[in-house]
Design a protein with these regions (language model features):
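N-terminal juxtadomain amphipathic helix
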Residues: 1-65, 70
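Phosphate-binding loop/pocket of nucleotide- and phosphate-handling active sites
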Residues: 274, 315-363
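Active-site-proximal loop->helix
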Residues: 129-181, 342-347
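Positively charged, low-complexity intrinsically disordered leader regions
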Residues: 50-113
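Short acidic, hydrophobic short linear motifs in intrinsically disordered regions
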Residues: 379-389
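A short, conserved structural fragment
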Residues: 409-419
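Active-site/ligand-binding loops adjacent to catalytic centers
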Residues: 170-183, 239-308, 345-357
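Active-site/ligand-binding-proximal alpha/beta "capping" segment
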Residues: 180-240, 275, 292-301
Length: 441
């Protein structure tokens, strides 16, 4: 059966034209991305399947959807004018789980069901596993998730709700390693570079071109993450022979506020580097104060209740706007991260956040440490490590837990009440402070 849309290796050009489940290029192990030579034809199908003629997974059944895609493309009335750009805002927070990832989860779930894969393992920083596991619930495929213990509380709870098994580990790198060790146990390991995920991501660029047209060059601003969104956007626009550039946004450092867009070594680094060398990609670093300011501007100038991660694309644009950009149509992607964290909202209201000052947004592990000590308990960090492992399934190293404790002390949320000698070792005894109790309440 000949398909209009084919998987093609970015590295060697090998094409997978028949229907089969593959993770990487069978020829060289490179990245596979869907290429479609056909016109953009929108059908009446729901979700990403409105563009089924341009999707590799289109011949698979049943097609899975939760109504993802077809998200609002809103012309900026004030921010674009203030920086001299023709600016549109693509609101991906309107997807079912609040992330553009839902587009890929629809095509991935369809493929997994079609190929009768019954279980998967997903290493994630939070959003990927929430989206994939949510869609797999519809087709009865079980999922196991590995996520860093530093993930925000809301993402930790969402993962616990939708995944069949969740394991908390020290870092995303450890999550990747543990997931890859499960390849013989689970039917598939879902990594960010999975071609069936990317198949669905492509519909973002397809929708943009369908709405805006092909007359003017495009600049698309996206969070860089692992690189899949930038690459999928580029290859859609390349297939359509459109002049374009991708502005990739990355956090300037790791912080609780922007941890979702802080990636030191993207999985697809070699492909991103090639795009940079060819002039299709420019990466911009955004810091906490810049993202917070952009979030405030989005609320007050455009009526967008979007958090710092979602507003980071606007922060990047404000940093690099130049005369040559005034001749193109610019689209900034707003994905997930609705403005709902009370500490971020408080900071915006009081305007107390200054450069290099952190907003206190705690991850799952730190919240659990505070909760453990919230009832007047005093204990050693070692005992905290044991309780986190036994009661909450946090499979962390002792060093990692001790580091969390030290950070909570530096934030004024824990304090050292005494030192005791146990088994020849001097151990500190810690307890929660009034500030820590207030934060929990």
């Amino acid at each position: 059966m000949t398909l209009e849309a084919k998987l093609r290796c970015v590295r060697c050009g090998y094409e997978v034209s028949e229907i089969k489940y593959v993770d990487l290029c069978p020829n060289c192990g490179g990245l596979l991305i869907t290429h479609s030579s056909g016109p953009l034809r929108r059908s009446r199908n729901l979700g990403v399947w409105a563009w089924s003629s341009n999707l590799y997974a289109s011949r698979m059944r049943p097609r899975i959807t939760l109504g993802e895609g077809n998200t609002p493309l809103i012309k900026s009335l004030n921010i674009g004018k203030s920086i001299g750009l023709t600016l549109y805002l693509k609101d991906e927070s309107k997807n079912p789980t609040g992330s553009f990832i839902d587009r890929g989860s629809a095509t991935l779930a369809t493929a997994l069901k079609y190929f009768k894969i019954r279980s998967v393992v997903v290493p994630s920083t939070g959003d990927l596993s929430i989206s994939v596991s949510t869609y797999l619930r519809r087709v009865g495929i079980s999922s196991k998730t590995y996520i860093p213990s530093s993930v925000t509380l809301s993402k930790a709870y969402k993962n616990l709700l939708v995944s069949d098994k969740v394991r908390f580990v020290d870092s995303y790198e450890e999550a990747l390693l543990k997931a890859l060790k499960n390849t013989q146990i689970y039917g598939a390991v879902v990594l960010p570079n999975n071609p069936f995920l990317i198949d669905g991501y492509r519909t973002i660029a397809i929708e943009l071109v369908h709405s805006i047209g092909k007359e003017k060059p495009l600049m698309i601003v996206v969070p860089i993450g692992d690189g899949v969104l930038a690459l999928s956007t580029h290859y859609v626009l390349k297939d359509l022979q459109l002049q374009h550039k991708i502005l990739g946004v990355r956090a300037c450092r790791e912080s609780p506020l922007l941890r979702d867009i802080y990636v030191t070594k993207p999985i697809l680094q070699e492909y991103l580097k090639e795009l940079e060398n060819l002039g299709f990609l420019e990466i911009v670093n955004v810091c906490d104060d810049e993202a917070l300011e952009a979030s405030e501007i989005m609320v007050k100038k455009e009526g967008f209740l979007i958090g710092p991660v979602g507003a980071s694309c606007i922060a990047a644009l404000r940093k690099v706007v130049r005369e040559s950009m005034r001749k193109v149509v610019t689209v900034a992607l707003m994905s997930g991260d609705p403005l709902q964290d009370p500490y971020v909202i408080k900071a915006l209201l009081e305007k107390t956040v200054k450069p290099n000052e952190q907003v206190v947004t705690l991850g799952f592990t730190k919240i659990k440490i505070l909760e453990t000590l919230a009832y007047g308990n005093q204990t050693y960090p070692y005992m905290l490590w044991k309780e986190l492992k036994q009661k909450h399934g946090l499979n962390l190293s002792r060093r990692s837990v001790y580091k969390h404790v030290e950070e909570l002390i530096s934030l004024g949320l824990l304090k050292v009440v005494s030192y005791e000698k146990v088994g020849g070792r001097v151990r500190k005894v810690v307890t929660i402070t009034e500030s820590g109790l207030k934060l929990l309440s």
